[in-house]
Amino acid sequence: MKITEVRLGLISVPLRVPFKTALRSVSSVEDVIVEIHTDTGAVGYGEAPPTGVITGDTTGAIIGAIRDHIAKTIVGRDVDEFEDLMIALNGCIQKNTSAKAAVDMALWDLYGQLYKIPVYKLMGGAKKSIVTDITISVNDPEEMVRDALNAIDRGYDCLKVKVG
């Protein structure tokens, strides 16, 4: 299974309610979508959120890192040489963690397809349950209390409260 092409796309998903922190207010979530195509027709998918304010990784930086460095490093290589692919991915450009993570996801997807094993099994198997949280946006204290109580009513028992 040889990598033949890396395609990039953008997606924007509107949020039901704007998410606010001290740094920004977000009303939609943007993602760079990565598709890695192979000579067998298999396609691996990954994604990277451009969160320049937090990570420094902007949409342009992610696309540029993948298009100008990472894709050139992995196209033509065999997915079965997984460890070498990962070493090449991590060594072809410094930093750019979001771009690398998106390609990493797509490579894991392809590796699982190659061996007909779901990625969750490749990574140790399924869990019966996982602990997750919900972040309460910065707002008036009364609205934050309402949001927290609403989250608890929806089954969350772990809250991350933004206070500034």
What role is predicted for each listed range?
Residues 1-32:
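Short, Gly/Pro- and small/polar-rich lid/capping loops
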Residues 33-35, 45, 160-162:
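Structured core elements
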Residues 31-33, 102, 131, 158:
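Broad gene-expression machinery/nucleic-acid interaction feature
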Residues 26, 96-104, 140-145:
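Glycine-rich anion/phosphate-binding loops
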Residues 5-7, 37-114:
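Metal- or metallocofactor-binding catalytic centers and their adjacent structured scaffolds
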Residues 121-164:
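Metal-dependent enolase-superfamily TIM-barrel catalytic cores that perform enediolate-based chemistry
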Residues 10, 50, 163:
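Residues that line or immediately flank small-molecule/substrate-binding pockets and catalytic motifs
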